[in-house]
A protein has these predicted regions:
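Bacterial N-terminal signal peptides
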Residues: 5-15
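N-terminal post-signal-peptidase region of extra-cytosolic proteins
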Residues: 61-79, 101-104
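Sequence context surrounding c-type heme c attachment/ligation sites in exported
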Residues: 25-28, 35-43, 47, 51-52, ...
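Amphipathic, alpha-helical segments enriched in basic
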Residues: 19, 58-61, 93, 133
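Alpha-carbonic anhydrase
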Residues: 30-32, 37, 48-51, 56-57, ...
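Boundary at the C-terminal end of the N-terminal hydrophobic targeting segment
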Residues: 16-22
């Protein structure tokens, strides 16, 4: 007799559980994040050139920083303005090359990946807001895995203090920025910073 009430209770509770994204993060047995081999085919959020968070630095070489996000996460973001559990953002660093092929001016990306970090939302593994950063020692090696960067590393404090949405730098990704504006999901920190900058 208890079977039907139990099934009804499950029917009510199960939709409340966040669904795992099919393209979400995967891990090794010891908790490292696996290299997301398909990320070049993910949603491209944006690229910065020679970005720095301090004004008094002069790079000795130019660098492109491109960000990709798994399609499942971006689909949810477009409807809600927030990143769901299972979000994987890949920051890919490539050097900039000058004249090559028919290019005589400006810069293009080099073929070698020089650096990679991953920003992941996984509430099952990470306490608090669920977000964690992972770094790769061999960024171009598809068989490699990334270790979680421990708090209180500067990447955490910087993102928490300045990120536009959910500790992510949506302010640098034009299409995602439009979504955040439409959904009014900017963080209080970002709004406060922008208000102060406008004065």
């Amino acid at each position: 007799m208890l079977r039907w009430p139990l099934l009804l209770l499950l029917a009510v509770l199960l939709p409340m559980q966040p669904a795992a994204l099919p393209d979400g993060p995967t891990y090794t047995a010891d908790g490292q994040i696996k290299y997301p081999t398909g990320y070049p085919e993910w949603v491209f959020l944006g690229t910065g050139l020679d970005m720095s968070y301090t004004a008094d630095t002069t790079p000795d070489h130019s660098m492109f920083n491109s960000v990709f996000v798994n399609p499942g996460a971006y689909k949810v973001f477009k409807t809600s303005g927030h990143w769901p559990d299972g979000t994987v953002m890949v920051l890919e660093n490539r050097g900039a090359t000058g004249a090559s092929s028919i290019n005589k001016r400006g810069k293009t990306e080099s073929s070698d990946v020089m650096g990679m970090e991953i920003h992941v939302k996984d509430s099952a593994r990470v306490k608090g807001d669920g977000w964690a950063f992972y770094g790769f020692e061999r960024p171009g090696d598809r068989n490699s895995s990334g270790r979680m960067i421990a708090r209180p590393a500067s990447c955490y404090t910087c993102h928490e203090a300045h990120a536009a949405v959910d500790t992510t730098f949506v302010q640098f990704y034009p299409n995602a920025l439009d979504v955040a504006k439409e959904k009014s999901t900017f963080s209080p920190e970002f709004l406060k910073e922008n208000t102060a900058a406008a004065k």
